[in-house]
Amino acid sequence: MSIEFTRRSMLQLAAAGMLAPAGAGFAQAYPARSIRLIVPFPPGGSTDLVARLMAQRLGDALKQPVVVENKPGAGSVLGTDFVAKSAPDGYTLVMAANSSIAPGPLMRSSMPYDPIKDFVHIAMVGSFPNGFMVRNDHPARTMQEFLALARARPGSLNYASAGVGTSGFLSGELLKQSAQVDMVHVPYKGSGPAITDLLGGQLDALFEGMVTATGYVRSGKLRLLAVTSERRVKAFPDVPTLTELVPGVSGAAWFGISAPARTPAPITERLQAEVLAVLQSADMQTRLGDLGMTPLPYGSTETLAFIQNEMRKWAPVIKAANVKVD
């Protein structure tokens, strides 16, 4: 076979669309087996709920199961570190969040991974405010009454969060500093155990993402006193924002999907496309909206910029509050 014939044949095949770049073939072959989506919190919390919604729809789109695995610990650091050190082959992903990526690491003296360099941040999923909830038999019927009670009885009231470094934890620290109240923080390894103890009467209050809080409030099991968003939540228009009562106390939790650094670009690009398609579907927009969440269909570049902005935004706040989780 002559060199000229080979070259001519290759050009003809390429023109016919029978040849594709190696990367395209790589992406088409992926995934060949099930994918693990690591949730660095226990079952039952906001991260877990959103992960399971995404896993079901991503699995349908990718034609392979996306299996949620819960790996809690150290305020979401353990599970996230597990993914950072996993094979960069697209088969182990993580639900990235405030506590593990930004601004959580700013509150720690050391981290086992670099939140920027050790991951490919594939896409954002969405954001939502935290809700400040109490059990139904709590004497405080409003946020004003809770703050008044806290001021009258310094150190006697407690509140929980899903763990040190989480958005709920940071909201609580900001509230204590700005409102000048002395409350005891009780950290948990995830939302599920904290909600159980709140319902059981072991806690006074809980900062929890509205994704999880909404169901408990609508069912009448817990009472929502305030939210951390800049504006009132549409689902609960009579519930005030914290910033209405204590100026400057606001913030939102966020979720994204990330892979280990060095995961091949064709794989991360395929995942990005599927995640964004899921988020832009009418079904998912409605489902997340019903949970009090704002979908944020950002690609990898926008997600990285968002994370870097979160670092800049919260760094001075954390420094002023002298927040350290280790």
Where are these regions (language model features)?
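N-terminal secretory signal peptides and thylakoid transit peptides that target proteins
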Residues: 2-17
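Short loop/turn segments at beta->alpha junctions
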Residues: 6, 75, 142, 187-190, ...
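N-terminal signal peptide c-region/cleavage motif recognized by signal peptidases
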Residues: 22-24
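N-terminal (or domain-start) structured segment
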Residues: 26-117, 156, 181-204, 297, ...
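An extracytoplasmic/periplasmic, membrane-proximal ligand-sensing/linker region
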Residues: 32-34, 178, 218, 265-326
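Hinge/capping helix and adjacent helix->loop/strand transition within the periplasmic-binding protein
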Residues: 85-91, 106-193, 242, 247, ...
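A ligand-binding cleft/hinge motif common to bilobed small-molecule-binding domains
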Residues: 101-110, 176-178, 205-237
